[in-house]
Amino acid sequence: MHNKIAKRKPAAKGSTVRPMKEQRAKDHSFAPIDMMGAKKTGLRTQFAALCYRLRKGKPEILLITSRRTQRWIIPKGWPQDGMRPAQSAAIEALEEAGVEGKLHDFSIGIYSYTKNHVSGRALPCVGIVYPLKVKKIHDRYREVSQRKRKWFSLAQAAHKVSEPELAHIIRNFEPNKIQNA
């Protein structure tokens, strides 16, 4: 397979095509991650847990802050040897958010983002999201002093995260459709 990049034709006079940044801000369109100059192994995969609970019949999503930038995110991490992807996501939920629960072993979506590595390199990543119904919340856990955690409604959580694809996954999350799965 060849790495050919399609060149965008200029917009026709009077068209409504807007630059991606402006369009994304208005309608949360999905923009591809920047793979310019990436090598065969350039795209990294992380496994993420969408931690949820039901309060008065309505779903709430647990978000945590990132360690360096304090952005609202969901727990996620690198694949772990000998574990299924969903198990890796559950381990991250425990370490980063201090929660355990009923793990669903199927993905509910994939989102893209750029991870700013400690080396200063920007790593293009995809996060594969697994739902986890929270049953137990720990007061003490590995990263308690490094992160904040907070419950949000679906709409609030979708608004708080900065990745448009993740916001879409959260906004459209329907836990009642996975209860018996």
Question: Could you say what each language-model-derived stretch is?
Answer:
Residues 2-56:
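Acidic, metal-coordinating catalytic segment for phosphate/diphosphate chemistry
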Residues 110-139, 150:
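Active-site-adjacent beta-strand/loop module that shapes the phosphate/pyrophosphate-binding cleft
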Residues 99-110:
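A short coil-to-beta-strand element that immediately follows conserved catalytic motifs
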Residues 4, 70-71, 136-181:
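Nudix hydrolase/Nudix homology domain
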Residues 57-100:
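Conserved Nudix-box catalytic region and its N-terminal flanking loop in Nudix hydrolases
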Residues 54-60, 118-122:
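Short, solvent-exposed loop/turn segments that connect beta-strands within catalytic domains
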